[in-house]
């Protein structure tokens, strides 16, 4: 019945949502966001972590309004359509760790699943390895699903619990308004800002926040999720979410061609490196973490807007992972992956396998 009452949850709805996200990403790039990074939840989360002082990497510090918009837009949709249902309590510490690991893997690759497709749509051939890694990581996750993997059931919670993340995001919007970036100043009040590098590149506040709000609203209604698209095809042979991802890529490719932002090649791509093995491995780690957590980083933010505190814990893990990645030198750069990052990929994969096996009933874990 839900599919009948939700006009967005149709093939046309998911195609439109994917297309709008792809076009919005390219336009945000045109208006100032970094190259092939018009929208990237991992990279933008890293910038947010830097802006509030969780790491001191000076080139990636900016309070990205798109992130707050995703949660607040989804919150508005959930309220309007009576889908704001506060819940949580499903292995919160595990979800926090999954969030940290997902961010570390994404920063080894230099992008979340959304940026995999945006890099491809911008002509970055290195993202092919990332796409293969993402698919491989999600496929590994489906092996655990077949064995009964579960983090336990979420429980209904008081309204106050579900309001925490939207209120936090509203507070961050207020901070961005009252403490805007000041030319040639690395700090304004409570917030840090990059003077060069990706963090210094951003679209105007109104456009960024507006795009985030609109995307959050649409994605909440359609359940847009890049990880879910791959999972559903592998497990159930269902293409609903995949249609949205394909529309996202197709629209971004078309927009980049029209805007002159398509630059095919492997070297000199913006905020990217050409080490294929580590592009692949980083996204295997990220993809498996997203699968075990139940959604890509964008989907997790949209769930925060619905009052899901488990998704909120995962989002906090993303911020912590960004801080660790830059404070400990795990994040890659255009020059390539660091030695610490290489070790981190192996350690993170081992932790993910441990979580997967110990949460499968057939392996002695809890259902």
Model regions and ranges:
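Membrane-interfacial helix-loop segments of redox and metal-homeostasis proteins
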Residues: 1-367
